[in-house]
């Protein structure tokens, strides 16, 4: 009988995941600076991975089960079956802008930038969700129709609307406005980090 392959998240969900395992049926151990986790059940192989990667790895059959966030299941559109809400790491996906900006929502922001013929730049790790959200904004549909916002990464540019751009973030997204981008789409639990970086939430994309 082959081992059960179990992927667990590294990063913001890591500590809570280890507490969950330690309070369950098994002892947990690992060596520092390694991604291998050992349970006292020899039938389970555990590896720590980035939560962004886990949905697709489970969908492709490389792992039998994994722990990740709903945000990454939604973003990757992976063909997986959510089994249980573990009820930790409660976050929401939001749009935030500098607190000096007067826009009430992102729809108003799109309309104003289009009126002034300014390029609107948004930074996010969530490229799929960002593009979908923007295309569903009334002002975007009115001005740009069915055009796709331009998604910009270090290795790729896709989309046919350079007037609204989504820039891939590799983290510390809240640090990018206002010099590098005009807005961000990011996850937050309490909003404290956003406020500390002079940002305010104007839209909630997903809870």
Stretches found by the model and what they are:
Residues 1-207:
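Domain-level signature for soluble enzymes in the chorismate/prephenate branch of the shikimate pathway
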């Amino acid at each position: 009988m082959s081992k059960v392959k179990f992927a667990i998240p590294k990063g913001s969900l890591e500590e809570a995941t280890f507490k969950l395992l330690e309070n369950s049926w098994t002892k947990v151990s690992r060596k520092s600076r390694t991604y291998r986790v050992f349970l006292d059940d020899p039938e389970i192989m555990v590896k720590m991975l980035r939560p962004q990667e886990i949905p697709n790895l489970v969908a492709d059959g490389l792992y039998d089960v994994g722990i990740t966030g709903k945000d990454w299941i939604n973003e990757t559109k992976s063909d997986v079956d959510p089994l249980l809400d573990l009820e930790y790491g409660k976050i929401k996906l939001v749009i935030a802008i500098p607190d000096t900006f007067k826009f009430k929502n992102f729809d108003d922001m799109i309309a104003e930038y289009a009126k002034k013929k300014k390029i609107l730049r948004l930074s996010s790790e969530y490229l799929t969700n960002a593009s979908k959200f923007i295309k569903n904004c009334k002002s975007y549909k009115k001005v740009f129709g069915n055009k796709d916002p331009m998604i910009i990464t270090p290795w790729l540019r896709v989309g046919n609307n350079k007037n609204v751009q989504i820039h891939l973030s590799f983290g510390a997204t809240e640090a990018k406005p206002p010099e590098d981008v005009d807005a961000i789409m990011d996850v937050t639990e309490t909003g404290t980090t956003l406020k500390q970086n002079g940002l305010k939430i104007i839209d909630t994309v997903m809870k």
